[in-house]
Amino acid sequence: MNLVTNELTIIIILYEEKIDLVFKCLENIKNFKIIIVDNANNISLKKKVKKKFQIYKYLLNKKNCGFTKAANQAIKLCDTEYILNLNADCFITEENILKLIISHKKYKNCFITTPTFYDEESKLSYNAGCFAEKNLKRDILNLEGNVCVDTVIGTAILFKKSDMLELGLLDENFFLYFEDDDLCKRIKLKNKSVIQIFDAKAQHVHGQLKVKNFLKKIFNRNYNFTYDELYYYFKINKHHEKYEYLKKKLPNYIIKSIINFLTLRPSQSIYYFAKVKAFYNFKKIIKQEKVK
């Protein structure tokens, strides 16, 4: 295989994505060095992918260790100057990837370059904007030209490996959510820039996972979001309001979880149970900090 460039490795973290989605993503980037980490330990998918595409490294994790840990695994394995972290539900061409690299080199204090997103109907889609704690509506940036932003969603971000190592990699206390806000906040503290590149286009289709156990999906989504949100606000010392709000809701959530369980509505029962468990696990962090 003739690589488009020796400067870049593309890393993709998988967890039960549909095979046609994965194949479509890989088809666009097949001439780059690719590292895949699969948190679903899907041996069958690995065989099918490697039969069709040339993959530099393909790791299978025996359990779902979370996006941040898997991404850090992949970053450490990269031996190129630049890394593009790409979700399987994001389709970007070689030309647009090269635009991200060129733009990154152009801006002296740049840490991340990210493309402008479009949906399946070729309409602008959200990718970048303000930090979550600003409580502003996350409007789509409809501006011509490259734009410095507070934060981006981690769907397609290009950065230097050396910069990420110096920053300390992704915070593995996050499982899936808010890690992009946290990353960008740490970047800002280093006086580095996060830039959305206007001329670099990508299609983000928000692919659905094919999780077999629907109840497990409900639990994981609500537990991880609740915990990660509390942890993010804890890191910036703004968790008190959310923590106290959830604390007041706990008795109601526990009752609702039990009632829904007894009335054979498992999805609702698990929804509330996930939030309760996330609260108590986060509470352990609060206690640890008080001991220090």
Where are these regions (language model features)?
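Short aromatic/hydrophobic "clamp" motif used to bind/position activated sugar donors
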Residues: 83
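Short, well-formed alpha-helical segments that are part of the catalytic scaffolds
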Residues: 12-30
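A conserved acidic beta->alpha catalytic loop
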Residues: 38-46
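Nucleotide-sugar-dependent glycosyltransferase catalytic core
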Residues: 125, 203-228, 240
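Conserved active-site beta-strand element of glycosyltransferases/polysaccharide synthases
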Residues: 158, 176-178, 184, 193-198, ...
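Acidic/His-rich active-site region of diverse nucleotide-sugar glycosyltransferases
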Residues: 73, 90-93, 98-169, 173, ...
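Non-catalytic, C-terminal membrane-associated alpha-helical segments of glycosyltransferases
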Residues: 22, 220-228, 238-292
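Glycine-rich, basic loop-to-helix element that forms the pyrophosphate-binding segment
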Residues: 61-78
